[in-house]
Amino acid sequence: MEVHHPEPHLILSYHNVLSSNEADKLVAAAQPRMVQASIGHGKEVSEMRVSRNCWIKDFESGHVDKLSPRFNWITKYQTSRPLDIHGEGKEEEYEHLQVANYGIGGHYQSHQDPMFVYKEPDFIVYSVQEKKIPPYPTGDRLATFMMYLSDVAKGGSTAFPRLGVAIKPQKGSAVFWHNLKRSGRSDMFMLHGGCPVVLGSKWVANKWIRETANMFHSPCGDHIDV
């Protein structure tokens, strides 16, 4: 484990999270499904990023199902569908694995991973469309667990400009950080982006950890700025 930035804006790297073969299998599973990155539930091509991506459900790939317990153990959070006594998962409590590919020139402008600007008892404000919508049953993106599925010859670092941190992709490693404060508000210091790929191809897998499935793993703070 490597600490890139200390608390309260903790950024960690875990090395050898995936073997080279496991990373290659995720890339192979994703390649036939890849589409141009978009926003707004796939209805609008994103101008913030130049990449392709896809979503893989746990039960669609035995490979992902086998990896999920490992992700849970590393992050200490529920990252995949929690199973009930009948062996069935509550899909509304988690977010599927996203695989993304950035070719030469591919990048992702600085952004925040939380989906909501702020929350009220009866509605939330969605950060992209600035519209009031009912609360998501999954809750917001509490934390991010991003795995590098390839090395990159040049460029492609993950940068946190407000913290002065830049992490070079290393195949099989993963980066972990919290997006929300204990109060549930977005941590604006966690602004980050994917630097342009200068040479090579960058593959990553993102597992966004949601609030609802982890409400007992991440106690709330008693102050709005916590």
Where are these regions (language model features)?
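Fe(II)/2-oxoglutarate oxygenase catalytic core
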Residues: M1-F176, L180-V226
